Amino acid sequence: MKSLALTLGDPAGIGSEVILKALADPSVGENYNITVVGSRSLLEESYHQLRSLPHVNHSDLVDPANLLILDIPLDKTTKSQIQLGKGNAASGEASFTYLQAAIAGTLKGEFAGIVTAPIAKSCWKAAGYHYPGQTEVLAQAAGVEKFGMLFVARSPYTGWMLRTLLATTHIPLSQVPTVLTPELMTLKLELLIDCLKNDFRLDHPKIAIAGLNPHSGEQGQLGTEERDWLTPWLEEEKKRHCEVELVGLVPPDTMWVTPGQAWYGNAPHPQHGADGYLALYHDQGLIPVKLMAFDQAINTTIGLPFIRTSPDHGTAFDIAGKGIARPASMIEAIKLAQALVNG
C-alpha cells in the first residue's frame, strides 16, 4: 500500500509538534502508512525539545527514529535562521520546499495522497513565493483550473458530518460581489456535487446554498445580487440537477442553525442537516465551521487528481514549542485522507 505524504509545514510553527503527537496516537500510528516529508534533523530537534518540557507526556510523542521520513535537509544558513515562534523567509523557503517534494512524489505515483501541515503565507511571500496558499500551489502543479476548498468535520456528539465548500476564498470582502458570477457558482456547485457523489458515495445529496446579503437581500431592499442573478441562477441549477436537492438561497444568519442542531444533537435526527453547504465567502463559511468544529475540521482540496487534506488551523507561532498544541485536527486530516484514498 502506498503511503500518504505528510509535510512538516512551516518549521517555526506547530507543524512538527502536531505531527509527533498525531503519529503517536494509537488510532493513527498503528493503522496508517505515513511518510513524513521534511527535515529529519528539525523533526528530531523538535522531539527532544518537547520531551524536555515537564508538562509533556513522553508517550504522547512518537520518536522520529520510528518514522518513515523523506529527508529534505536544509543548508546551514537556512537552518540557522529558523527559530520556533518566529516565521521568516527561511521558514517559508523550507515549507515551500517540503510541499514541492510531496507534490513531485505524488505526481510520480510514489504517494497515495498528501496531508499538509500549516504554512504561513507571509513567510512564503518573504521567501519570494507569491501564492494565496497551499491549495493554489497544488492546483497549479496538478494542472487543474477547477478546484475548491471543502471543510469537513464529523460531530463527536452525533457522528453527523459537516461539509462546507467556499465559493470564494482568500480575497478581501469588498471584492466578493465582483468575483462571484453565475459561472463561478456553477463551477463550485458542480465540484461539490461530484465530491459528494464520488468521494462520499451519496447518490442523492442535499445541498444548502447561502445568500450573499443579510436576509438574502430582502427582495432587493438589502442588496440586489440575490434578486438580479443568484436566485435565477439557482432555479436553473435545480432544473439541471434533478437528482440533487438544492435548498436556498438560505439567509446567511439562519444558514447554520440546522447544521448546529445536527452537530450538537438538538435536531429531531442528525439527517436534518444537509449533506453539503455552499458558502459564498471565507468568513461566512468558516466562522460557523470553527465555532462547531475547531479541533475536528479538516480542509480538503477537491478537483485535484489526488487526495489532499490538512488540519484547519494555522502555524500558531505564538504557542510553537510550548507543548500545548492539540493534534486532533491533524489526526482527523490523516484519517480522512486515508478514507478517501481507500474509497
From Swiss-Prot:
Swiss-Prot/TrEMBL catalytic activity: 4-(phosphooxy)-L-threonine + NAD(+) = 3-amino-2-oxopropyl phosphate + CO2 + NADH
Keyword Nucleotidyltransferase: no
One MF annotation (Gene Ontology) recorded for this entry: metal ion binding
Cofactors named for this entry: a divalent metal cation
Metabolic or biological pathway, per its Swiss-Prot or TrEMBL entry: Cofactor biosynthesis; pyridoxine 5'-phosphate biosynthesis; pyridoxine 5'-phosphate from D-erythrose 4-phosphate: step 4/5
Cofactor note: Binds 1 divalent metal cation per subunit.
InterPro entries named in the record: PdxA, PdxA_fam
Cellular-component GO terms for this entry: cytoplasm
Amino acids binding substrate: T135, K290, N299, R308
Binding site for a divalent metal cation: H170, H215, H282
One Pfam family named in its UniProt record: PdxA
Keyword terms: Cytoplasm, Metal-binding, NAD, NADP, Oxidoreductase, Pyridoxine biosynthesis
Claim: Mitochondrion is one of the keywords in the record: no
GO biological process: pyridoxal phosphate biosynthetic process; pyridoxine biosynthetic process
Protein's cellular compartments: Cytoplasm
Predominant location category: cytoplasm
Enzyme nomenclature, EC number: 1.1.1.262
Subunit: Homodimer.
Assigned protein family: Belongs to the PdxA family.
Other comments on record: The active site is located at the dimer interface.
Role of this protein: Catalyzes the NAD(P)-dependent oxidation of 4-(phosphooxy)-L-threonine (HTP) into 2-amino-3-oxo-4-(phosphooxy)butyric acid which spontaneously decarboxylates to form 3-amino-2-oxopropyl phosphate (AHAP).
Protein name according to UniProt: 4-hydroxythreonine-4-phosphate dehydrogenase
Species of provenance: Gloeothece citriformis (strain PCC 7424)
